[in-house]
UniProtKB/Swiss-Prot annotation:
<feature type="short sequence motif" description="LAPYISMD">
    <location>
        <begin position="490"/>
        <end position="497"/>
    </location>
</feature>
<dbReference type="GO" id="GO:0005886">
    <property type="term" value="C:plasma membrane"/>
</dbReference>
<keyword id="KW-0677">Repeat</keyword>
<feature type="domain" description="bHLH">
    <location>
        <begin position="14"/>
        <end position="67"/>
    </location>
</feature>
<dbReference type="GO" id="GO:0000981">
    <property type="term" value="F:DNA-binding transcription factor activity, RNA polymerase II-specific"/>
</dbReference>
<dbReference type="Pfam" id="PF11413">
    <property type="entry name" value="HIF-1"/>
</dbReference>
<dbReference type="GO" id="GO:0005739">
    <property type="term" value="C:mitochondrion"/>
</dbReference>
<feature type="region of interest" description="Disordered">
    <location>
        <begin position="354"/>
        <end position="389"/>
    </location>
</feature>
<keyword id="KW-0037">Angiogenesis</keyword>
<comment type="subunit">
    <text>Isoform 2 interacts (via ODD domain) with VHL (via beta domain). Isoform 4 interacts with HIF1A; the interaction inhibits the binding of HIF1A to hypoxia-responsive element (HRE) and HIF1A/ARNT-dependent transcriptional activation. Isoform 4 interacts with ARNT; the interaction occurs in a HIF1A- and DNA-binding-independent manner and does not induce HIF1A/ARNT-dependent transcriptional activation. Isoform 4 interacts with EPAS1. Interacts with BAD, BCL2L2 and MCL1.</text>
</comment>
<dbReference type="GO" id="GO:0006366">
    <property type="term" value="P:transcription by RNA polymerase II"/>
</dbReference>
<feature type="region of interest" description="ODD">
    <location>
        <begin position="452"/>
        <end position="581"/>
    </location>
</feature>
<dbReference type="InterPro" id="IPR001610">
    <property type="entry name" value="PAC"/>
</dbReference>
<dbReference type="GO" id="GO:0001525">
    <property type="term" value="P:angiogenesis"/>
</dbReference>
<dbReference type="GO" id="GO:0006915">
    <property type="term" value="P:apoptotic process"/>
</dbReference>
<keyword id="KW-0379">Hydroxylation</keyword>
<keyword id="KW-0804">Transcription</keyword>
């Protein structure tokens, strides 16, 4: 028995020993084959000697993919003189080249990837890119790898261009050190390239029939890292300038170079939005870049048109970075580096109100007008653009003098519009006070149309009181009759005297009839007896700009009057004259004292809104050629004529290419 057990054990041990020897031999053979395969790869011998088996297999698969890709028709057509330039390509590029398969595997990366990410070429080739990008960017990359399908039935090629931003892992620090992959940070890369489909060369099967393979889908990208503004050297050159914005893209700082390249002074841009100086056709693309900036921290815009001060535009590209100066979102700001691609083009084309001096939305300079800019008596005002309906109130003239000849203080468009009204009122108006010795700053000659323009009846209805004051009071009293109202169902009364949204067109009285025996309710006047303060000539208020000057605002009643609404009006009637004076002081301009003469009411204007002041189109009674183009650009006129070029008499020029400025129009103001 013992001898049998010993023989069985010896046989088992011999088998195990033979199995271990066979496994050791197979592993040695595999290692030898893998190292031979590693030396076959196009790497330096010192690099391939330190590769493990998994890396050798990964790099071999990637090499076979690139070999098939390079054997395709388009890749195989390489000029004889192209090889010496391969080393210069990487030096000229500010990024690295990356080739992705349809599954997202990195088939190839250029050698200079380590300068931008800190990871070597061998560490990335063959891996899936989804393991190295931010989780929030994986869906965007998957959409870029998917071929876009066209919905048209015609055979139209799908767009192959791709441009997006990715956040990849980077082991580089700001001081140039390399960290571990577990401590890597995110770095924003601007990726641009094309989706390619290459047909491999046809191969013949053993049966003799050609074996066709599906085309190879790959995404060829150039990835450029966006530099941080703090790493830029101070001299940016004449073709670039720096600016800082708030999170809503309003200028908080701008470099002085903006005056040389675009004609703006830094003070003109402070507080203005950057969107106001971008061409309307490029605003959508810039808005997408700003959205990427706020979500990823850095972004690079495409080539867009930045509007110049005196007309025209400059082709520009911007690198933007969100910089945090402390804790909280309020301490964040956006620093932009603008690179100019061209000089000023199309200098005669005005594309925005910011490019005109008279329609500029920047704050007015508070100071005395210079002797050169002060108009002289007899000068005319030429406004070829949007109509300007303005009525100035010189402080040196009395109310009676203004009422006697109001057309002297109207713009030409306003005189044409109010011509029939002013003619009819000037016959009845008699000045009670002689004219002051001081003449107005801009007297204008009257130019009235012979016929009644269209819409004058509506203007007469808005600008004049068609009924007497007593008739208006009668209608309001009837509307508030106690027999027709249920006081328990009424909301508390709130005074609307200070509501700036009310105007004369919304306060027209309704057609009620006053019953017999009704007692009229006493009314307070719309104008209170306050003398106007002395104002500077540059700060003349516009008539109708103060809602308290509206002749149609509801007036307060007398607390002693017997009114059915006395219980609901206690809070309004309890206001003192001191509160009213405080409201006037908050406005900054005290309304002038109104003359008790009823014949002056024909010259009071209702509150003009901004849309009414900037109404586009020709003035009533004027002729305009409908074939005269506003702009010589192939773009929709959705912005309206009031926001486009107001110069219809100048010869427009055809816009040049974005990178070929014409001679004569390439000088910046």
């Amino acid at each position: 028995m013992a001898l049998g057990l010993q023989r069985a054990r010896s046989t088992t041990e011999l088998r195990k020993e033979k199995s271990r020897d066979a496994a050791r031999s197979r592993r040695s053979q595999e290692t030898e084959v893998l190292y031979q395969l590693a030396h076959t790869l196009p790497f330096a011998r010192g690099v391939s000697a330190h590769l493990d088996k998994a890396s050798i297999m990964r790099l071999t698969i990637s090499y076979l993919r690139m070999h098939r890709l390079c054997a395709a028709g388009e890749w195989n057509q390489v000029g004889a003189g192209g090889e010496p330039l391969d080393a210069c390509y990487l030096k000229a590029l500010e990024g690295f080249v990356m080739v992705l398969t349809a599954e997202g595997d990195m088939a190839y990366l250029s050698e200079n990837v380590s300068k931008h990410l800190g990871l070597s070429q061998l560490e990335l080739i063959g891996h899936s890119i989804f393991d190295f990008i931010h989780p929030c960017d994986q869906e965007e990359l998957q959409d870029a790898l998917t071929p876009q399908q066209t919905l048209s039935r015609r055979k139209v090629e799908a767009p192959t261009e791709r441009c997006f931003s990715l956040r990849m892992k980077s082991t580089l620090t700001s001081r140039g050190r390399t960290l571990n992959l577990k401590a890597a940070t995110w770095k924003v890369l601007n990726c641009s390239g094309h989706m390619r489909a290459y047909k491999p060369p046809a191969q013949t099967s053993p049966a003799g029939s050609p074996d066709s393979e599906p085309p190879l889908q790959c995404l060829v990208l150039i990835c450029e890292a966006i530099p941080h503004p703090g790493s830029l050297e101070p001299p940016l050159g004449r073709g670039a300038f720096l600016s800082r914005h708030s999170l809503d893209m309003k200028f908080t700082y701008c470099d002085d170079r903006i005056a040389e390249v675009a004609g703006y002074s830094p003070d003109d841009l402070i507080g203005c939005s950057a969107y106001e100086y971008i061409h309307a056709l490029d605003s959508d693309a810039v808005s997408k870049s700003i959205h990427t900036l706020l979500s990823k921290g850095q972004a690079v815009t495409g080539q867009y048109r930045f509007l110049a001060r005196s007309g025209g535009y400059l082709w520009t590209q911007t690198q933007a970075t969100v910089v945090s100066g402390g804790r909280g979102p309020q301490s964040e700001s956006i620093v932009c580096v603008h690179f100019l691609i061209s000089q000023v083009e199309e200098t005669g084309v005005v594309l925005s109100l910011e490019q005109t001096e008279q329609h500029s939305r920047r704050p007015i300079q508070r100071g005395a007008p210079s002797q050169k800019d002060t108009p002289n008596p007899g000068d005319s005002l030429d406004t070829p653009g949007p109509r300007i309906l303005a009525f100035l109130h010189p402080p040196s003239l009395s109310e009676a003098a203004l009422a006697a000849d109001p057309r002297r203080f109207c713009s030409p468009d306003l005189r044409r519009l109010l011509g029939p009204i002013l003619d009819g009122a000037s016959v009845a108006a008699t000045p009670s006070t002689p004219l002051a010795t001081r003449h107005p700053q801009s007297p204008l000659s009257a130019d009235l149309p012979d016929e009644l323009p269209v819409g004058t009846e509506n203007v007469h209805r808005l600008f004049t009181s068609g009924k007497d004051t007593e008739a208006v009071e009668t209608d309001l009293d009837i509307a508030q009759d106690a027999d027709a109202l249920d006081l328990e169902m009424l909301a508390p009364y709130i005074s609307m005297d200070d509501d700036f949204q009310l105007n004369a067109s919304e306060q027209l009285p309704r057609a009620y009839h006053r019953p017999l025996g009704a007692v009229p309710r006493p009314r307070a006047r719309s104008f209170h007896g306050l003398s106007p303060p002395a104002l500077e000539p540059s700060l003349l208020p516009r008539w109708g700009s103060d809602p308290r000057l509206s002749c149609s605002s509801p007036s307060r009643g007398d607390p002693s009057a017997s009114s059915p609404m006395a219980g609901a009006r206690k809070r309004t009637l309890a206001q003192s004259s001191e509160d009213e004076d405080e409201g006037v002081e908050l406005l900054g301009v005290r309304p002038p004292k109104r003359s008790p003469s009823p014949e002056h009411e024909n010259f009071l204007l209702f509150p003009l809104s901004l849309s009414f002041l900037l109404t586009g189109g020709p003035a009533p009674g004027s002729l305009q050629d409908p074939s005269t183009p506003l702009l010589n650009l192939n773009e929709p006129l959705g912005l309206g004529p009031s926001l486009l070029s107001p110069y219809s008499d100048e010869d427009t020029t055809q816009p040049g290419g974005p990178f070929q400025p014409r001679a004569g129009s390439a000088q910046a103001d």
